[in-house]
C-alpha cells in the first residue's frame, strides 16, 4: 500500500493524504495515516526505487546534536522535539535512505521520525548520505532525481532504470 503522493505510473493500493505546505507537518500527517492503517511498513521518500528486499537502518556520520546546531527555524524546532524524545546521545537517521518502520507512539507535533525509529531499532549501519554525496546506485536501492543537477545525469538515471527494468512491472500503467 502506498500512502501519500502517488506517482503517475503507479496503479496499486493507495491512500491519498492531502499535502501540507510545511514539509514537516506533511510527513507527520502521512505517518499518522500509516500508523492508523499498518503495524509495520517501509518509510521512504518518493525519489527512491527499491532493487531488493530492504530492512537495514542506516545512520549518518554526522551526530544529531551537530545537525541541530547547524540548522534554524522550523527544522530546528522539529529536531529539538526529536531530541527531547530520544535523548542527547541519539544517532542521526535523517538520511535519504528507506527505513523499515514499526508502529511507535507518535507525538502530536512533527518530529524527525527516522531518528526516533532508528534509535528504537538498534543494529544500525553508519553511512554518508547518498543525496549529499551523489551516490546513485546502492546495492539495495536506487536514489532518484534529487541527486542530479544536469541533464546528462538525468539521462544516466534513465539508462540505469532501463537496464534494471527492461519490462514494465504490474504496478505501472
State the predicted function of each range.
Residues 39-51:
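Short beta-strand-to-loop acidic/aromatic patch adjacent to the donor-nucleotide binding site
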Residues 6-9, 21, 48-50, 55-56, ...:
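Short, solvent-exposed loop/turn segments at secondary-structure junctions
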Residues 22-34, 157-172:
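Extended catalytic core of nucleotide-activated donor transferases of GT-like folds
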Residues 70-156, 165:
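Catalytic core and acceptor-binding pocket of nucleotide-sugar-dependent glycosyltransferases
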Residues 3-39:
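Active-site-proximal specificity loops/subdomain of glycosyltransferases
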Residues 1, 12-15, 121-128:
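Structural alpha-beta junctions
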Residues 50-81:
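Conserved donor-nucleotide/metal-binding helix-loop-beta segment in metal-dependent transferases, i.e.
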Amino acid at each position: 500500500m502506498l500512502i501519500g503522493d502517488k506517482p503517475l505510473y503507479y496503479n496499486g493500493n493507495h491512500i491519498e493524504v492531502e499535502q501540507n505546505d510545511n514539509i514537516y507537518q506533511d510527513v507527520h500527517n502521512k505517518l499518522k495515516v500509516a500508523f492508523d492503517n499498518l503495524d509495520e511498513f517501509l518509510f521512504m521518500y518518493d525519489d527512491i526505487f527499491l532493487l531488493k528486499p530492504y530492512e537495514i537502518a542506516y545512520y549518518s556520520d554526522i551526530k544529531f546534536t551537530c545537525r541541530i546546531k547547524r540548522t534554524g527555524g522550523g527544522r530546528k524546532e522539529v529536531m529539538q522535539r526529536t531530541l527531547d524524545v530520544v535523548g542527547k546521545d541519539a544517532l542521526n537517521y535523517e538520511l535519504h535512505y528507506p527505513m523499515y518502520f514499526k508502529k511507535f507512539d507518535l507525538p502530536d507535533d512533527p518530529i524527525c521520525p527516522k531518528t526516533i525509529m532508528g534509535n528504537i531499532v538498534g543494529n544500525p549501519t553508519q553511512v554518508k548520505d547518498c543525496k549529499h554525496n551523489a551516490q546513485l546506485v546502492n546495492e539495495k536501492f536506487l536514489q532518484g532525481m534529487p541527486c542530479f543537477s544536469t541533464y546528462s545525469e538525468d539521462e544516466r538515471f534513465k539508462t540505469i532504470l532501463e537496464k534494471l527494468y527492461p519490462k514494465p512491472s504490474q504496478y505501472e500503467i
